[in-house]
């Protein structure tokens, strides 16, 4: 793409099309300058960070809220703008750092990032929020499918990690909130996902869906 200053730049494009009668009628998305990638991506895992995740979630909320609805307040189209937010917190991460050292903990985070990426589609977004917390944004997905995908992610993260000469067992507690909840803001979705994750962790549920 050409920058406003007239120079050629490489960009990353992420977008979501809206369909009417099977025909794409509009698209919303974002372009990011890859030269500025460093400030928006996590250096350890090479995943998007909190700002990019929040920006994409805000776009999906706007699309979902603007979708045509029927008399019951349910999206009239076939879930094209539905989405789900997952918050994942690794189990026993502090113990891994304390026992094996931070270098092993860092490699564990890198392996978790790659497993998460392998569990989602190209339209989805995986981000590292802070420490051992990750968010996943699943696009164009209904609540039942989102719950199934969260269970698949939980199973993938529970498998042993081989890091050097060590075999590490971790896994994750996952909170899930679907756009079917019709929450109004980014912070509302993140708080709901956090509450569900906390319940999953304290009650050893693996995955907990916000109700």
Language model: regions and residue ranges:
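Per-ARNT-Sim (PAS) sensory domains and their PAS-associated C-terminal
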Residues: 1-19, 23-25
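Output-coupling edge of small sensory domains
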Residues: 15-18, 32, 159, 177
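Short catalytic/binding micro-motifs of nucleotide second-messenger systems
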Residues: 17, 63, 118-123, 155-167
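PAS-family sensory domains
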Residues: 23-34
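PAS-associated C-terminal cap
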Residues: 32-39, 49
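Conserved long alpha-helical elements within nucleotide-processing catalytic cores of c-di-GMP signaling
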Residues: 45-84, 91-121, 127-131, 135-139, ...
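Cyclic nucleotide signaling catalytic output domains
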Residues: 126, 152, 156, 166, ...
